[in-house]
């Protein structure tokens, strides 16, 4: 059946009556004062159902009952009558709800208790109902005292228009939970910041000189590179290079000297002298015996160079040679072996000895 069987009639007094075919189920006649917003919702619902396919019209009409409950059954009018010396049998409480969207508060008066077998209980009042109108007077924005005065001034007959406060009560609970969670989050955030600062102090020391430490991404290598100094591998490399340079320098002195220094200074003694060093700053010249030997050898070598007639040595080489910490160039072993061989050649032995004995 088409939706044209669905009749809508509105009287001059604003009353609305619904009639539907039996295929859609029977609807009770609802009579009440409707607003323009309610009429607009009904018209939108009718237009929506009319455009749906036939198979979905039944489902849409079934869902329309929930919209009807929201617009009408949430609001009900209750009349409570009491005896002269009796009570209505209910208690009210006023709540102030904070509206987060518009930064304002809403005041609502709610029934918090209903006595059994009381006039209010028999009239149908329930816990959680919110006062919207009392004796034709809207209670929107009323304080608790104003609502109490309005109820007491009504006499024995009280007409109350109420709203279902389940959603509002649920909203109040959610707002309270939200505020609690915000407070907890704020405390946890403070604890997190404190732990972060403690971690920064443990890792990087005093943070007084760096107030913006939490905003900086510090690299571990840049933090510890200047504090730890060179790596052990670098120290070993420097120590080996220094020791090898000293060994090469002393070996050149040992090969070239002919005054008994060669017999008293061997490679093992050199290794032992350099193994007793305890610091890398002075490198390999800390041994007292090594200092004396190197000083004597240097003086003897300088004397031999000064009296030698050969001009193969440059002044730059002499200045570097006289420096204790300089790496001295040495003669090749091939030249030294040649001198040893020339000693055994007849006619040349005397000349070599005379040349070597000048210093």
From Swiss-Prot:
Record-linked SMART domains: PDZ
One GO term of the biological process aspect: regulation of cell adhesion
Keyword Coiled coil: yes
Predominant localisation class: cytoplasm
Domain PDZ as annotated: residue spans: 77-166
Keyword list, A-Z: Coiled coil, Cytoplasm, Endosome
Record localization: Cytoplasm; Early endosome
PROSITE patterns (alphabetical): PDZ
InterPro entries: Intracell_Traff_Signaling_Reg (IPR052122), PDZ (IPR001478), PDZ_sf (IPR036034)
UniProt feature coiled coil, ranges: 165-188
SUPFAM superfamilies: PDZ domain-like
GO cellular component, one term: cell cortex
Residue span of region Interaction with CYTH1: 166-188
Quaternary structure note: Interacts with CYTH1 and SNX27.
Biological role stated in the UniProt entry: By its binding to cytohesin-1 (CYTH1), it modifies activation of ARFs by CYTH1 and its precise function may be to sequester CYTH1 in the cytoplasm.
Protein name as it appears in the record: Cytohesin-interacting protein
């Amino acid at each position: 059946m088409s939706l044209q069987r669905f009749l809508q009639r509105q009287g001059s007094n604003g009353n609305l009556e619904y009639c539907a075919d039996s295929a859609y189920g029977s609807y009770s006649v609802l009579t009440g004062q409707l607003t323009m917003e309610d009429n607009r919702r009904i018209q939108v619902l009718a237009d929506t159902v009319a455009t749906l396919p036939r198979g979905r019209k039944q489902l849409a009409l079934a869902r329309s009952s929930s919209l009807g409950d929201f617009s009408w059954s949430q609001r009900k009018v209750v009349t409570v009558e009491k005896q002269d010396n009796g009570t209505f049998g209910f208690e009210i409480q006023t709540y102030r709800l904070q509206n987060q969207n518009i930064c304002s508060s809403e005041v609502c008066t709610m029934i918090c208790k209903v006595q059994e077998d009381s006039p209010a209980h028999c009239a149908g009042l329930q816990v959680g109902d919110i006062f919207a109108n009392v004796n034709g007077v809207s209670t929107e924005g009323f304080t608790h005292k104003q609502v109490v005065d309005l109820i007491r001034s009504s006499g024995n007959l009280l007409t109350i228009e109420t709203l279902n406060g389940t959603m509002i009560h649920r909203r109040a609970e959610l707002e309270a939970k939200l505020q609690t969670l915000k407070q907890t989050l704020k405390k946890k955030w403070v604890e997190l910041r404190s732990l972060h600062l403690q971690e920064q102090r443990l890792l990087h020391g005093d943070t007084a000189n760096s107030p913006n430490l939490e905003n900086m991404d510090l690299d571990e290598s840049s933090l510890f590179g200047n504090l730890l100094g060179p790596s052990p591998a670098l120290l070993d490399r420097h120590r080996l290079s220094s020791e090898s340079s000293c060994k090469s320098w002393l070996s050149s002195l040992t090969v070239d000297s002919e005054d008994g220094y060669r017999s008293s200074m061997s490679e093992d003694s050199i290794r032992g002298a350099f193994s007793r060093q305890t610091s890398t700053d002075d490198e390999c010249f800390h041994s007292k015996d090594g200092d004396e030997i190197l000083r004597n050898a240097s003086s003897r070598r300088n004397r031999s160079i000064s009296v030698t007639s050969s001009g193969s040595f440059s002044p730059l080489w002499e200045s570097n040679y006289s420096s204790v910490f300089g790496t001295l160039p040495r003669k090749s072993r091939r030249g030294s072996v040649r001198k040893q061989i020339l000693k055994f050649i007849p006619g040349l032995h005397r000349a070599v000895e005379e040349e070597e004995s000048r210093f």
